[in-house]
Curated annotation (Swiss-Prot):
It comes from Arabidopsis thaliana. Signal peptide: none annotated. It is a multi-pass membrane protein. The lineage of its organism: Eukaryota, Viridiplantae, Streptophyta, Embryophyta, Tracheophyta. Keywords: Membrane, Transmembrane, Transmembrane helix. This is Tetraspanin-2. May be involved in the regulation of cell differentiation.
Length: 270
């Protein structure tokens, strides 16, 4: 019985440690400029990480103090949390699978088409009901102004692969419009305005830029997709470890109960 409880305590400690990368991934996502504006996807992972931390601590105390009730609560709650984490992972994978990016000849960065992203993201993140608020939030960030500090010449800008999807979509006009580069957020004399409806929406007003463009909406979704795919990799590894820990903990708990039953039987209590 003591050996089984000690094993369960160690496993709960491991589960508790697993909550750290989950919470850290959520905080990292929430700290990004785009996620600061998109409240819908902001905190689910953080909340799950904190709940796993609390439940794992409960299980650790239950195993350390030989409290079967706490262990039973731990096993029940952890099963629910692992299930919820799997739902979040599968959901995030499905809605971020479509990729609206495309390469532009002579450019180190990609550009983005809104049509290439999932319908769920388009309908729930960048729909007309939400975009006014998102646009104002993005305009208040340092996403576009910092480009003028990082890139001086056109060659530097055009060859860079470090420009984020959000910057590519919101801070400059689409390449097809044929605007001439002055600086990363100032473009003049377009040669092909009919190439894209966004060509007419571009403004050199630094509070406007291409925030009203479909390319900006696509860039925002491109950023979300890129960040969630990175976070998903960490979460997948963590959830595999959590499932492994949970299965062993269930087995140890069941064996401990069986040993306790046999011990009572031998003592004539049953």
């Amino acid at each position: 019985m003591a050996l089984a409880n000690n094993l369960t305590a160690i496993l709960n400690l491991l589960a508790l440690l697993c909550s750290i990368p989950i919470t850290a991934s959520g905080i990292w996502l929430a700290s990004k400029p785009d996620n600061e504006c998109v409240n819908l996807l902001r905190w689910p992972v953080v909340v799950l990480g904190v709940l796993i931390l609390v439940v794992s601590a409960t299980g650790f105390i239950g195993a350390y103090k030989y409290k079967e009730t706490l262990l039973a609560v731990y096993l029940c709650c952890m099963a629910i949390l692992i299930g919820l984490l799997l739902v979040v992972l599968i959901f995030a994978f499905v809605v971020t699978r479509p990729d609206g990016s495309y390469r532009v000849p002579g450019r180190g960065y990609k550009e983005y088409r809104l049509e290439g992203f999932s319908n769920w993201l388009k309908e729930n993140v960048v729909d007309s009901k939400n975009w006014g608020r998102l646009r104002a939030c993005l305009a208040d960030t340092n996403v576009c102004p910092k480009l003028n500090q990082e890139f001086i010449t056109a060659d530097q800008f055009f060859s860079s692969s470090k420009i984020t999807p959000l910057q590519s979509g919101c801070c400059k006009p689409p390449t097809a419009c044929g605007y001439n580069f002055v600086n990363p957020t100032l473009w003049l004399n377009p040669t092909n305005m009919a190439a894209d409806a966004d060509c007419y929406l571009w403004s050199n007003d630094q509070s406007q830029l291409c925030y009203n463009c479909n390319s900006c909406k696509a860039g925002l979704l491109g950023n979300l997709r890129k960040e969630w795919r990175k976070a998903n990799l960490i979460l997948i590894i963590t959830v595999v470890v959590l499932i492994w820990v949970y299965v062993i903990a269930c087995s140890a708990f069941r064996n401990a109960q069986t040993e306790d039953l046999f011990r009572k039987y031998k003592q004539g209590w049953v």
